[in-house]
Design a protein with these regions (language model features):
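Sec-dependent N-terminal signal peptides
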Residues: 5-13
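N-terminal, active-site-proximal structural segment of metallo-dependent hydrolase catalytic domains
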Residues: 16-86, 97-104, 181, 293
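Active-site-proximal beta-strand elements of phosphoester/diester hydrolases
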Residues: 31-43, 107, 120-124, 149, ...
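Catalytic metal-binding/acid-base residues of hydrolase active sites
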Residues: 40, 76, 167-169, 202-205, ...
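Structured beta-strand-rich core segments of catalytic domains in phosphoester-bond hydrolases
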Residues: 69-160, 269
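Active-site neighborhood of phospho(di)ester-bond hydrolases with catalytic His/Asp-centered motifs
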Residues: 70-73, 95, 197-201, 223-226
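Metal-dependent phosphoester/phosphodiester hydrolase catalytic core
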Residues: 142-144, 153-181, 190
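Metal-dependent phosphoester-hydrolase catalytic domains
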Residues: 151, 174, 178, 185-196, ...
Length: 293
């Protein structure tokens, strides 16, 4: 009986390993994989969905898809440090939104150090407020909100580009609109060469004016969902709570945006779950992209 169990475990491990290798090899050599993932902050009132009950699933999911960059939202410092310990090939940038250090939620940006390096002095977090250089909130925002970004170099190609990660306010419409304008201004200031990606939980659907501010005019932010050369894979929603349900309406509030000189090869929203529950109340969004030479 023990021998049979061990044999089955070995077979499962081999199949899982082969599946992972197929996933890795399916990605084109010069392409870049991006993920945006709201982790849900460690709330002790979440019961069965508390962080300690799902953190291994979150780490396993990220490890399996192995994005070159992933921007997480809502994670507290111990959640970010847990992922840092579990995902050894990654480093990260970001600060707590409450004090600019370790307090409060982070919108940290994680990158694979095997292939990419952060260009010295470019990693930064600003507040989406009228005083962006200090912990603050403005307009009708319920909470402080931040934008974390850095300029990275691909060690294999030498190409340099910016990646931005953010989490917009869940209450203040004016704050969200002004936050969108701040991001556009920051892109225009730093990435005028057109090499950039924007990840985040924007807390708006496509019919909200914030989406129009982001996607219209210059600098252009192209929704990877609509520009994928291959059909979208997975659900059409990114936020519906922990419990798996049927008949969920389209509700994308988490996005990956790309610049004009980028091909989007693939786009997916990942609906993995265990025992009827997702590992977070948001689903991760992933895209495979490639710069146009």
């Amino acid at each position: 009986m023990i021998k049979t169990g061990l044999t089955l475990l070995l077979l499962v491990s081999i199949v899982a390993g082969c599946a992972h290798e197929r996933h890795q090899s399916a990605q084109q050599e010069d392409s870049i994989s991006l993920m945006s993932y709201n982790l849900r902050f460690d709330n002790p009132n979440d019961g069965i969905n508390a962080w300690d009950n799902r953190k291994e699933h979150v780490a396993a999911l990220i490890r399996f898809y192995a994005p070159d960059f992933f921007g997480q939202q809502e994670g507290l410092i111990h959640q970010v440090e847990y992922l840092d310990d579990e995902l050894e090939e990654y480093d990260w940038i970001g600060v707590g939104r409450d004090d600019g250090d370790r307090a409060g939620e982070l919108s940290s940006l994680h990158y694979n150090t095997v292939r990419f390096e952060l260009i010295e002095g470019t990693g930064q977090t600003i507040w989406l407020s009228e005083t962006p250089d200090e912990p603050s909130r403005s307009w009708d925002a319920a909470l402080p909100r931040v934008l974390t970004f850095g300029k990275f170099r691909d060690k294999t190609t030498g190409r340099e580009f910016y990646v931005f990660n953010t989490h917009f306010d869940h209450i203040g419409q004016t704050a969200r609109e002004e936050s969108a304008r701040i991001i556009k201004q920051k892109i225009e200031e730093l990435a005028s060469d057109g090499n950039y990606f924007v990840l985040g939980d924007f807390n708006v659907r496509e019919d909200n004016p914030v989406y129009e501010i982001l996607t219209m005019g210059n600098p252009p932010l192209r929704d990877a969902f609509y520009h994928s050369e291959n059909p979208h894979v997975g659900p059409l929603f990114t936020f519906e709570g922990f419990e798996v349900k049927s008949g969920v309406e389209q509700r994308r509030i988490d996005y990956i945006f790309v610049s004009e000189n980028v091909r989007v090869l693939n786009h997916a929203i990942l609906g993995h779950f265990r025992n009827g529950y997702y590992p977070s109340d948001h689903l991760p969004v992933i895209a495979e992209v490639m710069f146009v030479e």
